[in-house]
């Protein structure tokens, strides 16, 4: 393994560790790292599809740890994925290029991080799961955006769950993890059904190794060790880092 590939794998490991700690797959970070490496010359479809594959691995590991620790609430998760799956699949079949999407996503991430910061770190009372007429369109919109941009949607869903007090940080992480997994799979399926799949499994193998280790470390810390307020702070960091990486990609 040459030094360049080793550096990429280490960076992917770090991203997977941080994102898995809050139940995310890490696609935003993976896209940024790959774009800043020699793989940046690849088409957007190649980058998105490989990021989705890494998402599948890390989100699965994260969900398992948060589920095992008793943080998953099915009645919170199901309404959000009902519409997100078909819309992510449809969006994944679209061929989307242009920097406008990077800019819009960066704005969304910064706003989400700012809102999380301004509400403070106190937990407050959980209001309970949202009504289906609210959760279904919310999940659908995030699913569509995920398929267009190349993410799993965790960085968009988690802030909403916390700001609306529909979930604790750890239950939000569990829901975000399964949400990311189904959206990533749906988006890849959409690309496959539209004959746009360009996966290189020999390229993915070392990446898988790196993110599996990071995913285990991060999700174990987030599910079993970190206090709730630490999870909130980690999520703010994740959102800011993802936004900064997107902005860098515009230049």
Question: Where is each model-derived feature located?
Answer:
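Residue-level recognition of oxygen-bearing side chains
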Residues: 77, 156, 177
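Central hydrophobic cores of alpha-helical transmembrane segments in multi-pass inner-membrane proteins
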Residues: 56-60
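Juxtamembrane transmembrane-helix boundary motif
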Residues: 1-21, 25, 29-45, 61-145, ...
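Gly/Ser-rich catalytic serine loop of serine hydrolases
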Residues: 153
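Alpha-helical transmembrane segments of helical membrane proteins, especially in multi-pass transport
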Residues: 186-190
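Transmembrane helix-bundle signature of multi-pass membrane transporters/permeases
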Residues: 48-55, 85, 173-181, 239
């Amino acid at each position: 393994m040459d030094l360049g590939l080793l550096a990429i794998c280490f960076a992917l490991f770090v991203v997977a560790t941080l994102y898995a700690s809050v139940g995310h797959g890490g696609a935003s970070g993976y896209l940024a790292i790959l774009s800043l490496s020699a793989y940046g010359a690849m088409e957007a479809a190649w980058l998105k599809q490989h990021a989705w594959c890494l998402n599948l691995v890390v989100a699965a590991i994260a969900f398992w740890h948060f589920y095992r620790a008793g943080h998953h609430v099915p009645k919170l998760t199901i309404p959000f994925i009902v519409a997100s799956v078909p819309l992510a699949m449809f969006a994944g079949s679209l061929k989307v290029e242009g920097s406008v999407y990077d800019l819009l996503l960066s704005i969304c991430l910064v706003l989400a991080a700012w809102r999380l910061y301004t509400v403070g770190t106190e937990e407050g009372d959980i209001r309970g799961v949202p009504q289906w007429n609210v959760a279904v369109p919310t999940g659908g919109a995030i699913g569509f955006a995920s398929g267009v941009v190349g993410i799993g949607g965790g960085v968009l869903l988690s802030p909403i769950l916390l700001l609306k007090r529909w979930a604790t940080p750890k239950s939000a992480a569990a829901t975000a993890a399964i949400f990311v997994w189904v959206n990533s799979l749906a988006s890849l399926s959409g690309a496959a059904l539209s004959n746009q799949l360009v996966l290189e499994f020999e390229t993915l193998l070392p990446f898988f190794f790196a993110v599996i280790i990071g995913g285990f470390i991060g999700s174990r810390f987030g599910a079993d060790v970190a206090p709730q307020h630490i999870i909130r702070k980690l999520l703010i960091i994740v959102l800011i880092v993802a936004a900064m990486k997107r902005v860098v990609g515009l230049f």
